Amino acid sequence: MAQRAVWLISHEPGTPLCGTVRFSRRYPTVEKRARVFNGASYVPIPEDGPFLKALLFELRLLDDDKDFVESRDSCSRINKTSIYGLLIGGEELWPVVAFLKNDIIYACVPLVEQTLSPRPPLISVSGVSQGFEFLFGIQDFLYSGQKNDSELNTKLSQLPDLLLQACPFGTLLDANLKNSLDNTNFASVTQPQKQPAWKTGTYKGKPQVSISITEKVKSMQYDKQGIADTWQVVGTVTCKCDLEGIMPNVTISLNLPTNGSPLQDILVHPCVTSLDSAILTSSSIDAMDDSAFSGPYKFPLTPPLESFNLCYYTSQVPVPPILGFYQLKEEEVQLRITINLKLHESVKNNFEFCEAHIPFYNRGPITHLEYKTSFGQLEVFREKSLLIWIIGQKFPKSMEISLSGTVTFGAKSHEKQPFDPICIGETAYLKLHFRILDYTLTGCYADQHSVQVFASGKPKISAYRKLISSDYYIWNSKAPAPVTYGSLLL
């Protein structure tokens, strides 16, 4: 696993090139290995100028890039991985790992230890995951405590020396560049106990452990025969351990009720020291997989000082929390809408907020509205062609609510009115936004009494959980709609 080159590019809309290479590093020894491994399919690393132009074009970040380009924008080229192929001088440079964050484009080219023709599957290219870890480490270093451009420039000037230690000869040794900074500025001091690479100091103060479980539920609902509704839960467990000592040991347990949905596809933080194999083998890829493990999920770890994501997981819950249908029909100069939403009986009926956003794309401003709602309030944003149905904090006892009415629009202004290439004609959706505190759809919770801490002092244990909607769509059942098959992608 190694990297052939790395770039940091500032995105500057309005300038002639739309960007500037702030930092770049090439690794000639890795490039020689790439030439051997790739053989006839080898494509050399280009100069900064051609690379900058090709990358901005592929990311659609050029100011004059408004037209549809078949090779980049067709449905066969939908990119969901932040991994690209760049056409440079008639040849394609692949794989290029790149993403935009805080107006900085982070990019690198991992070494592929095999021929590139035919293109190997990404899962077989181990340098890709290391490339992401490398770029995320640089991002964390640049923006940890960074307050202004001068501090950013200072950190950019430190990168050449830091990468000599963190990534010598293109091989990543430590993604935490702060460790390399400490080694550069201070002489090494022999310590009685070695600290892990992700921990840069010790804590002094009142001991406490905080555990927060956040589940995001996605859904695409159609209310159509022959098209299956899809939904998926993605969970994140975030921890903050304020404990004295160089390497305090902690064991955190996640539990499920008897009717809970098993956790799958679990990814853990590097500070986890060991793990039951049953936790790692539970996968959502195979629908016939019977390896579901219902817990308890124990994570022994040596926590870092800062807040960290202990693990991520998915879960295949039996039903979405809110089921509904949306019907929109065009009648002469107005639209007739009918909406019905039903909260599942197993879901906690206590929201921090719950709203249904009903946008009308590719139309003029709302000039007239007549409606009837069984529950909640309706807000109208006329210029934005948007209705927001404020449901509030609870559904009624029936768990079912409805909204119906007619909407009339004025003349469309191309400059102000919202445009969407999918929502043409009667193709439309409503999007649900909600949050429920002290609740998870899987039932997953952190048992405060089962948290084991091997450190001085008795810590205060706090546990929180919440469910949040994410990409929760209900499409008009009277018109065509984009369809997702199988499980929703992360």
Curated annotation (Swiss-Prot):
Pfam families: Adap_comp_sub (PF00928). It is found in: Cytoplasm, Cytosol; Late endosome membrane; Lysosome membrane. GO terms for biological process: endosomal transport; protein transport. Transmembrane segments: none annotated. SUPFAM superfamilies: Second domain of Mu2 adaptin subunit (ap50) of ap2 adaptor (SSF49447). PROSITE patterns: MHD. The keyword Translocase does not apply. Keywords: Cytoplasm, Endosome, Lysosome, Membrane, Protein transport, Transport. GO terms for cellular component: AP-type membrane coat adaptor complex; cytosol; late endosome; late endosome membrane; lysosomal membrane; lysosome; membrane. CDD domains: AP_MuD_MHD. It is a peripheral membrane protein. Its main location: cytoplasm. As part of AP-5, a probable fifth adaptor protein complex it may be involved in endosomal transport. This is AP-5 complex subunit mu-1. It comes from Macaca fascicularis. The lineage of its organism: Eukaryota, Metazoa, Chordata, Craniata, Vertebrata.
